């Protein structure tokens, strides 16, 4: 008999309470066991993946799938090596649990500790990438969270084998800590379980993430679009600006931290635009410009439309606009951006400061490519994704983003009555260096 989604979530809830109390050593050992098992059973994984890829290529020929989806779906020995290394890297990261975030004396013998703990049950829904299943499961385990995994049907064979490997490798952990759901209708059931699932992490297209956000009351960690900007100020080192704008678009155009709109101050447009246009042309980047940009470039590029300023291309396409001031650049980004990542290229530190303070984005850079917006590059280790929200976690989200906290109060028969009324004793409320010990 097939286990229902509700039963799987119930099992995950029970497991989450036990997993939160597993030792750091146990979680590390089980992650190493996952890495070893994937390595030992790589032929089985690749065989399953080949079935998914063959079916996907048929859908590609029929015009149902994109080449990008097929590419994301493919696994190889080299890709499995990277997955295995990622799991071992997660195992080696510092334990995010049981950390004393603050310690405060309320009164003599009455001490309050703020301590990091797992979130609980995390539901994740992702498209096309079987490596995402392993990454999310590994990060969930390291942070002491139970996880519900729902991958796309296009990767069903790969996901099923990888899940079985993970489940069997962690047989000594609380049963049900990781659950796989496969049917499309299970997603809607999952979205309605706000009393059982503590956090949802969708990974996929903008439309996909928007659907998740619009159809659940469970907190959602993620972003719908990556409409990132580079602004070239009139005080910029223009050679640096060309290198940054090129790297931000060309180095890996399909990811969410690639630049989509290039803003250029009008005072340097005549000098700068021909240089960056030539570099982009060498890489077959399609440019779409406003009237001022096209005038400088002799109208050799397509005219930008209003939709271009809000588009995440995920491809070798960039929109270019000439602006008359720093203020105009800031206004354009705040109006059209997705609050992901923005960069200013300038030698004027004051303008850089204004740009970084005035923008409402998760990551703001000075003289650096937007492609640095990444958990690994930030030193956070493997990441579960980028969050453009402002509650709980923001920007690249690593292990710490999968934890919350609880308050531990240590007293010695203290009563609230002592601190109330006319003769109330005052609180000391003094922070101190201390660690809560279970």
From Swiss-Prot:
Principal EC category: oxidoreductase
PROSITE patterns listed in its UniProt record: PROA
Involved pathway(s): Amino-acid biosynthesis; L-proline biosynthesis; L-glutamate 5-semialdehyde from L-glutamate: step 2/2
Keywords on record: Amino-acid biosynthesis, Cytoplasm, NADP, Oxidoreductase, Proline biosynthesis
EC number: 1.2.1.41
Main location: cytoplasm
Keyword Amino-acid biosynthesis: yes
One Gene Ontology term, aspect cellular component: cytoplasm
GO biological process: L-proline biosynthetic process
An MF annotation (GO) of this entry: NADP binding
InterPro entries the UniProt entry points to: Ald_DH/histidinol_DH (IPR016161), Ald_DH_C (IPR016163), Ald_DH_N (IPR016162), Aldehyde_DH_dom (IPR015590), G-glutamylP_reductase_CS (IPR020593), Glu-5-SA_DH (IPR012134), GPR_dom (IPR000965)
Keyword Endoplasmic reticulum: no
Record's subcellular location: Cytoplasm
A Pfam entry, by short name: Aldedh
HAMAP family found in the cross-reference section: ProA
Similarity comment: family membership: Belongs to the gamma-glutamyl phosphate reductase family.
Chain's role: Catalyzes the NADPH-dependent reduction of L-glutamate 5-phosphate into L-glutamate 5-semialdehyde and phosphate. The product spontaneously undergoes cyclization to form 1-pyrroline-5-carboxylate.
Protein name, UniProt field: Gamma-glutamyl phosphate reductase
Native organism: Natronomonas pharaonis (strain ATCC 35678 / DSM 2160 / CIP 103997 / JCM 8858 / NBRC 14720 / NCIMB 2260 / Gabara)
């Amino acid at each position: 008999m097939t286990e229902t989604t509700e039963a799987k979530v119930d099992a995950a809830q029970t497991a989450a309470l036990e997993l939160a109390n597993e030792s750091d050593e146990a979680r590390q050992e089980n992650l190493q066991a996952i890495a070893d098992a994937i390595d030992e059973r790589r032929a089985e994984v690749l065989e399953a993946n080949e079935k998914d890829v063959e079916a996907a290529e048929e859908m590609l020929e029929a015009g149902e799938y994109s080449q990008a989806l097929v590419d994301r779906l493919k696994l190889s020995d080299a890709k499995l090596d990277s997955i295995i290394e990622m799991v071992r890297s997660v195992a080696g990261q510092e334990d995010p649990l049981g950390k004393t975030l603050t310690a405060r004396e309320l009164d003599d013998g009455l001490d309050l500790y703020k301590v990091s703990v797992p979130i609980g049950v995390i539901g994740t829904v992702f498209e096309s990438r079987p490596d995402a299943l392993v990454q999310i499961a590994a990060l969930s385990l390291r942070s002491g969270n139970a996880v519900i995994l729902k991958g796309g049907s296009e990767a069903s064979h790969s996901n099923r084998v990888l899940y079985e490997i993970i489940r069997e490798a962690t047989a000594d952990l609380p049963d049900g800590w990781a659950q796989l759901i496969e049917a499309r209708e299970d997603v809607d059931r999952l979205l309605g379980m706000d009393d059982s699932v503590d956090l949802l992490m969708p990974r996929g297209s903008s439309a996909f993430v928007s659907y998740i956000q619009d159809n659940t009351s469970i907190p959602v960690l993620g972003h719908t679009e990556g409409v990132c900007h580079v602004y070239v100020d009139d005080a910029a080192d223009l050679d640096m600006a060309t290198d940054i704008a090129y790297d931000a678009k060309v180095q890996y155009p399909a990811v969410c931290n690639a630049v989509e709109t290039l803003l250029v101050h009008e005072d340097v447009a005549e000098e700068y635009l021909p240089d960056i246009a030539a570099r982009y042309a060498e890489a077959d980047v399609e440019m779409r410009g406003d009237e001022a940009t096209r005038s400088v470039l002799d109208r050799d590029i397509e005219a930008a439309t209003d939709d271009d300023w809000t588009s995440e291309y995920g491809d070798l396409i960039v929109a270019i606009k000439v602006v008359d001031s720093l203020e105009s650049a800031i206004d354009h980004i705040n109006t059209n951006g997705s609050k992901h990542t923005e960069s200013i290229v300038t030698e004027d530190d004051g303008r850089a400061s204004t740009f970084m303070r005035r923008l409402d984005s998760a990551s703001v850079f000075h003289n650096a490519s937007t492609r640095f917006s990444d958990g690994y590059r930030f030193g956070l280790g493997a990441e579960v994704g980028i969050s453009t929200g402002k509650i709980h976690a923001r920007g690249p989200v690593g292990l710490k983003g999968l934890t919350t906290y609880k308050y531990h109060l240590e007293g010695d028969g203290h009563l609230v009555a002592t601190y109330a009324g006319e003769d109330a004793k005052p609180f000391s409320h003094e922070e101190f260096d201390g660690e809560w010990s279970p």
